[in-house]
Amino acid sequence: MDYSHRGQQFRLTNNLKYKPEAAAEMEAALHAFRTSPHVVENYKRITNEVRPYPPFITARLQRAAFYLFRFEPDYTMKLAQELYEGVDTPWGRTGMITYPRTDSYHLSDHAVDEMIAILTDHYGEEADEYVLMTKRQFENKTNAQAAHEAIRPTHFSEEYWPGVAQQYLTEDQTRLYEMIFYRTMSTQVRNALYDMSILEVDVGGNKLIGRAYERLFDGWERLDGHRINIAERNDDPNAFKYREVVLPEFDVGDELRPLEITTV
């Protein structure tokens, strides 16, 4: 069901599915949708903060590299080992990432302090709005080796940002390094904020439901969030729920006029 309210078009759905034995029920519902008033029964304004994903451990790194680049796990670890052992740079042979075999989400205080300083400079006047000034904590698995660190860049200063570092790396090394770099940096950026409001409309006893999914503040997602989300949601059977849906605001009792009634 397509509507327009306060200048915003949107669509609501009914869970009624066509079955030959329920044809009469379907016809009655369609008749109600065409002839009965469409009245807002419930509107709940919900905003939800979305945290960044934790820094990479080995298994998550392999999974993300496969989803984004179709790298096989062994190839991902070969590239990661090369980045760990070091590449030739103008200031000598330099390890680009920490040890790539780990099951810990821990980041050292020194690394976090460096990230905060670099991000504060990167965001400039927006730093207070974007940069998390205290260390974000991620819970390890009970058997994780907490003394180890997650997979992260060894340094975060300008010469180590992917756009600069790529001149010292192969194409595939750059892909993996960039993914690790932004994933790590995003952990010290504030949460994204989404409108996830719920709308229920009554039409002659039939219920139509809509759920918003609109980003209000990008937060950590500004740092390559699109690719980070793709890597994490690729195997989510409910990935469709992340498509943007914008709903206007409503008052209970508002009467809506449908623009189009369709059946699938």
Task: Please report, for each region that a protein language model flagged, where it lies by residue.
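Core catalytic DNA strand-manipulation module of type IA topoisomerases
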Residues: M1-V264
